[in-house]
């Protein structure tokens, strides 16, 4: 079984889309193994977006992720990463297919509702930013 980190970003929380996002992952057959609402620190956001550190939009990403509460969750299932990425849709919501979370709800490329780990390596780095091992259920 594979796991994937999902974040409902500040715009998703602010727009009351938490339940909708969670239910889409559950309907896809993915089990929730960890779930919490939290405020992201600047240090956590910088670590999460570290692959973008040298890009001009890095500071905007960090500011956005720390602008309000998020919901962090870990889902598990067969091909959890690929399934989660398909559910999320293209990063740019204007290019995301209808029926995907971003296609249905995204406001722009930054305020795009959700994050989903894009690889097993990303998941292994990312989940440790948001969860301690004792917060993850077997």
From Swiss-Prot:
Subcellular location: Cytoplasm
CDD domains: NDPk_I
Essential cofactor(s): Mg(2+)
Keyword RNA-binding (UniProt): no
Active-site annotation: 115
Primary location recorded for the protein, binned into one broad class: cytoplasm
Binding locations of ATP: 9, 57, 85, 91, 102, 112
GO MF, any single term: nucleoside diphosphate kinase activity
Keywords for the protein's UniProt record, in alphabetical order: ATP-binding, Cytoplasm, Kinase, Magnesium, Metal-binding, Nucleotide metabolism, Nucleotide-binding, Phosphoprotein, Transferase
Enzyme class of the recorded protein, top EC level: transferase
Family: Belongs to the NDK family.
Function statement: Major role in the synthesis of nucleoside triphosphates other than ATP. The ATP gamma phosphate is transferred to the NDP beta phosphate via a ping-pong mechanism, using a phosphorylated active-site intermediate.
Record-linked HAMAP family: NDP_kinase
The protein, known as: Nucleoside diphosphate kinase
Organism, as annotated: Picrophilus torridus (strain ATCC 700027 / DSM 9790 / JCM 10055 / NBRC 100828 / KAW 2/3)
């Amino acid at each position: 079984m594979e796991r994937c980190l999902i974040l409902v970003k500040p715009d998703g929380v602010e727009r009351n889309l938490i339940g909708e996002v969670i239910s889409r992952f559950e309907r896809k057959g993915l089990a929730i193994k960890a779930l919490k609402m939290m405020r992201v620190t600047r240090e956590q956001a910088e670590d999460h977006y570290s692959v973008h550190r040298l890009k001009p939009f890095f500071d905007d990403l960090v500011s956005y992720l720390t602008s309000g509460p998020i919901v962090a969750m870990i889902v598990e299932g067969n091909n959890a990463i690929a399934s989660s990425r398909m559910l999320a849709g293209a990063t740019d919501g204007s290019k995301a297919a209808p029926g995907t979370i971003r296609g249905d709800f995204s406001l722009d490329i930054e305020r795009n509702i959700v994050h989903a780990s894009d690889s097993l390596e990303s998941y292994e780095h990312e989940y440790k930013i948001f969860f301690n091992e004792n917060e993850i259920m077997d």
